[in-house]
Amino acid sequence: MKRRTARERAMQALYQMDITGELEPKIAVENTLDEGEETNEFLESLVVGFVENKEVIDEAIRQNLKKWKLERISIVDRSILRVAVYEMKYMEEIPHNVTINEAIEIAKTFGDEESRRFINGVLSNIKDTL
């Protein structure tokens, strides 16, 4: 599985967890996989890592929102931000610009017209604080 695909699946897993409020990370990951597709370490580390660091990640996002509340952001955008912020804060081997570009590409696919600009702005602000 390519890293872009893993990031997309991680976003989808966080989306499911946000909607249900109680789904286990491993089950959420399994629900995103196509038939016969297997998970990989990168995908699982994104989802489990977010769950383990949810408060820190959400606070980093909150502090970089202008005129927005985290709870008012679309679930898709919130999930994309959460995956990207986890990656930026805890996966130091991945350059921040790569993470931001990947998040923007995922936003183009799954978000609305404004998603990519919004996500780019928030992640760029967060990058400056790391």
Curated annotation (Swiss-Prot):
<comment type="similarity">
    <text>Belongs to the NusB family.</text>
</comment>
<dbReference type="InterPro" id="IPR006027">
    <property type="entry name" value="NusB_RsmB_TIM44"/>
</dbReference>
<comment type="function">
    <text>Involved in transcription antitermination. Required for transcription of ribosomal RNA (rRNA) genes. Binds specifically to the boxA antiterminator sequence of the ribosomal RNA (rrn) operons.</text>
</comment>
<keyword id="KW-0889">Transcription antitermination</keyword>
<keyword id="KW-0804">Transcription</keyword>
<keyword id="KW-0805">Transcription regulation</keyword>
<dbReference type="GO" id="GO:0003723">
    <property type="term" value="F:RNA binding"/>
</dbReference>
<dbReference type="InterPro" id="IPR035926">
    <property type="entry name" value="NusB-like_sf"/>
</dbReference>
<dbReference type="GO" id="GO:0006353">
    <property type="term" value="P:DNA-templated transcription termination"/>
</dbReference>
<dbReference type="GO" id="GO:0005829">
    <property type="term" value="C:cytosol"/>
</dbReference>
<dbReference type="InterPro" id="IPR011605">
    <property type="entry name" value="NusB_fam"/>
</dbReference>
<keyword id="KW-0694">RNA-binding</keyword>
<dbReference type="GO" id="GO:0031564">
    <property type="term" value="P:transcription antitermination"/>
</dbReference>
<protein>
    <recommendedName>
        <fullName>Transcription antitermination protein NusB</fullName>
    </recommendedName>
</protein>
<dbReference type="Pfam" id="PF01029">
    <property type="entry name" value="NusB"/>
</dbReference>
